[in-house]
A protein has these predicted regions:
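Cap/insert and terminal regions of metallo-dependent hydrolase folds
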Residues: 172-269
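Binuclear metal-dependent hydrolase catalytic cores
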Residues: 1-169, 174-179, 189-190, 247-291
Length: 291
């Protein structure tokens, strides 16, 4: 299973000389499953570069949206495969009593916000609400569950063979509670991240910033690390960086996170901050024990 980060920023794109190392594009993660199936997790501005990296040939792509805030869908109309008639795109997302997924996305992909409307996309595009039960895409088993954030919001777990990826980019698990005191069943997103090979998790705020943003739907560094420790994730990537944080500030946040992880008795190499174009590879099968 190959994973590549195409957009790691939260809220709004933050291009410029101070965000070169970690990137300024908003949320998008590319996942290539062991059978070659291609997934995109969210469609922020990072999906534009993901699309440009795809070969111009018939393909079936799945886009899994966590929610419909602009920073997670604003790249859809700049996704090159959507303008190829030979491409089939399946867009998954949260259900809402308000309107269908297609109709909610069409509010953005329509005038006056977009020069292109959903019905004008030349690709074969379909929209599906994520089921409450596990389902399959290619070689993977996919699970979606509601998590603590503003509006209908999902986190995802992707299991392919013996490897698992948990993707929870917008998440406030500590809202009104101490994570270390909660039982597992009361921790938002716990089942998605339990013993994950790789956890990509919201880490937007420093601990000093969080008190002014309680209820906004995002995590402080300490909350993200407590969540990772409680769930037993093997490796954690902090994601959805605040647009106000420069590369140097994120470097400092990363050092603080690793020091805190050492305090938990953990290996600091298992904690890192997500950077655009970073790649990870998870084995679909665990190595066999030596005989």
């Amino acid at each position: 299973v190959k994973i590549k980060l195409w957009g790691t920023r939260g809220s709004i794109p933050a291009p410029g000389p101070e965000t070169i190392r970690y990137g300024g594009n908003t949320s998008c993660v590319g996942v290539t499953l062991s059978d070659g199936s291609m997934l995109a997790l969210d469609a922020g501005t990072g999906i534009r570069c993901l699309g440009l990296a795809q070969p111009d040939e018939p393909a079936r792509l799945h886009i899994l949206l966590t929610h419909l805030h602009l920073d997670h869908i604003q790249g859809l109309v700049f996704f090159a495969p959507a303008f190829r008639p030979q491409t089939e795109i399946v867009i998954w997302g949260p259900a809402s009593p308000e309107a269908s997924l297609r109709d909610r996305i069409a509010r953005y992909i329509s005038a006056p916000l977009s020069p292109v409307e959903v019905r004008e996309l030349p690709c074969d595009v379909s929209f599906r609400h994520c089921p409450e039960s596990e389902w399959e895409i290619g070689s993977a088993r996919i699970r979606a569950a509601s998590v603590s954030h503003r509006g209908p919001t999902l986190g995802y777990r992707i299991d392919d063979g013996d490897s698992s990826l948990a993707y929870i980019p917008d998440h406030e698990p500590a809202l009104g509670a101490d994570l270390d005191q909660l039982e597992e069943d009361w921790i938002s997103g716990f089942a998605l991240a339990r013993d994950a090979s790789l956890l990509i998790h919201d880490g937007q705020y420093t601990d000093a910033e969080y008190p002014n943003h309680v209820g906004w739907g995002h995590s402080a560094t300490s909350h993200a690390l407590s969540f990772a420790r409680r769930t037993g994730a093997d490796r954690t990537v902090l994601f959805h960086h605040d647009p106000m944080h420069s590369d140097d500030e994120l470097d400092a946040l990363g050092r603080e996170a690793r020091d805190r992880w050492i305090g938990f008795g953990g290996d600091p190499a298992r904690i890192e901050l997500g950077a655009e174009r970073a790649e990870y590879e998870l084995p679909a099968r665990a190595p066999s024990a030596l005989v």
